[in-house]
Structure formats: C-alpha cells, structure tokens
Amino acid sequence: MIEQLRQRLRALEKPAEIADGLGGLPLGVAAIDAALGGGLARGALHEIAAVSEAHLAAATGFALALAAREHARLVWIAEDMALAESGAPYGPGLDAFGLAPERLLTVSVARSHDLLWTMEEALHCRAVRIVIGEVRDSAVSTVALRRLSLAAAKSGVLALLLRASPTDETSTAATRWIVGAASSVIPGRERSERTRNPEINAEVASGFRVRAFSASRNDEEIRPRFAAQLVRNRCGPTGSWILEWSDSDERFILAPAQSVAAPALDRPHRQIARQVA
C-alpha cells in the first residue's frame, strides 16, 4: 500500500505530460505554449497567485480567461468571506470573457478546509472540465495539494487553485503563476487612454464586476492586460509576459511593446545659437 502511494506521488513529480490523449490547454501564445509542452496540462493542478491582494481581480480574470478557452462546464468554489469581500462571479463580465454563465456552477463554503474537500470531490466529476478553488488561507498542507493533484490526474479535469498572494511552500502543482494587472488600453488610443491605476486595471481584468470605465465608452474595445509570471513549470522553462486578452478571439496575445518618447537630439546651447545668428 505504501509503495503504491509512493509510485503515484512519484508520477506527479514527472513533467506535466497528460496521459490518455488529453493534451494541454493552449493559451494561444506560441512562446508560452512551447514552454508548457503544448499548453496548460489537463488532469493536473495549477496554482495562480495574485502579486498582492490588490491584484486579486487580475488573477481572477486570468483564471476565468483560461476557463473560457476550455469551452466546457466548470465549478467555482470560494469561501464565504472571499465572496463577501470580492463579490461573486458577474454574468455580463463572464460573457465578456466568452464564458457563458450557464456553464458555471458556484459553490460557497465556510472554511478553507471545506473548500479543499469540495474541490477534491468536484475533481472526481467527469461532467466538468475545470475546477477553480479560491483559497484565502496562505498555508495549504502538502497532503491536501497532493490529494488535489491525484484527483485531477485520475479524472483528467483541469484544477486551478487561486490564491490572494504568492507562496513559497512546497507544492505538487504542475505550474505556479503569479499574476498582476498591467496597464490596459483602448486600441488605437494607446497614448491617451492608458490606465495606470492598478485597482482600475484589475477590475477591467476581472469578470466579477462591470467594466471599470464609464458607459460612454465602448467597453468591448477595452482589452485587459495581465503581467503573468510562470515561476514554476514541471514541463520546461519559466518566464514572464505581458498578456492581452482578446474577447473576440477568446485567446491571449502578447501585448504590443509600449511606445517610448524619442530621445532629444543634440542642439546648441541657446546663447551659442544667438551668437551664430
């Protein structure tokens, strides 16, 4: 019995190559998908942490965008306190991500222990393809993480553990991401309409609320941006990218490089110029 358990745990330590032809969930960015061996491994646990609590909405939006790309039913599990502080998933916001609200089942629990148990049970259900658990407790036991990884591997369901802040604790997760809000723009008006308030950018990047801009603007034009760091990857290299979510294509794209002011040309001092004149 103990040896069998050890073999199962050793299997989790291998690169996140999914058996039974499940493959990976591509993000749509060639460099990232290559680093992930084709995409985010299905049948595995992945951790997504916000840079800080101020960026939790951005991390949430990143998770929702991944869920939108799967085009399947999903379960969202959150603690009562998290729902009270951050709000529940918001229908129009989900629609903007290409995630039909009827595909989502939301479950609220009282404690982080209940959340992890519910998440594990949901992973046993083959009727869903993604299970997202939003945990506020910074410390999650290694045993609980292993159980989640084993449950995901058995069912082939994609498991996302959403955290309010980064952690260095040992994990069986196939990948670990740290996500923050990047400056969002309105296409064609990058110079004048760039938003630099992280709280506003985070709300734009989340499907939890109405888009942060006024109704006088065409909110569908606003493309949320994410500063995504892949800090742990069992399948290959790590890296960091500024990603933009395209609602119309339901995929991530690399954000265009921000333009910078051209350096001033050398010119003669005003007094010298006057003398020459």
Task: Please annotate each region the language model reported.
Residues M1-W76, G93-E102, Q258, D266-A277:
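Detector for small/aliphatic-rich hydrophobic stretches
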Residues G28, A59, S86, L115, ...:
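Helical mechanochemical/support elements of P-loop NTPase systems and associated helical scaffolds
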Residues R73-R129:
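Conserved inter-motif catalytic segment of the P-loop NTP-binding fold
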Residues D95-F97, A173-S183, A228-Q229:
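Acidic, Ser/Thr-rich peripheral helices and adjacent loops at domain boundaries
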Residues S108-G180:
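P-loop NTPase motor core
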Residues R189, E193-E221:
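A cross-taxon signal for low-complexity, glycine/charged-rich
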Residues I222-C235:
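A conserved mid-domain beta-alpha-beta active-site/ligand-binding segment of alpha/beta enzyme cores
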Residues N233-A277:
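C-terminal regions of RecA-like/P-loop NTPase motor modules
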